[in-house]
Amino acid sequence: ERKNWNLLFAGLAFWGMDWFNEIWNGLIFHFNAYAPVWGAPGKTAYLILIGLNIEICFMFAVAGISFGKLLPADKKLRIMGIPNRLLLAVINSVFCVFVEVLLNRVGALTWDYAWWGAKAPWLIFLIGYLPFFLVSFWVHDMDSVRKKVLTVGTILGVDLAALLIFGAFLQWI
């Protein structure tokens, strides 16, 4: 779709939110020297951070746009009495947690803590995905491209600053 700024910025917001999570995950590993909250083991074309490889990075870039395409045009539409953006954020988050459980079962994603895994999926839901969707859909619905640029620019700017400070300068991640 040409000039669909809503989808483009929703996708960038989703992707930027993932980068933030990947950065703090790397910091967890740095500070505890035991394990990250999640890890990306195995073969990859390029491991970016301990829980993020290039394949996952591209998946999150595409996912934000793909999930944005599911949004009804009517922002105020309610489904079963629930605002559609909230309901879709919850449903999509549950779906993503389910996919992560499958990836963990085949060894493509590691979890080393009892509080983050298939037996305790609520944190993956609440921290790992729900904020991604809520922010992505919020950006999607902003009434001007300027607001979208400022919001996504802030998200990506925080990510870049954290990567420079904790990665390039301190070499913690």
Q: Which sequence ranges carry the predicted segments?
A:
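Aromatic-rich, lipid-facing transmembrane alpha helices and their immediate juxtamembrane interface loops
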Residues: 1-173
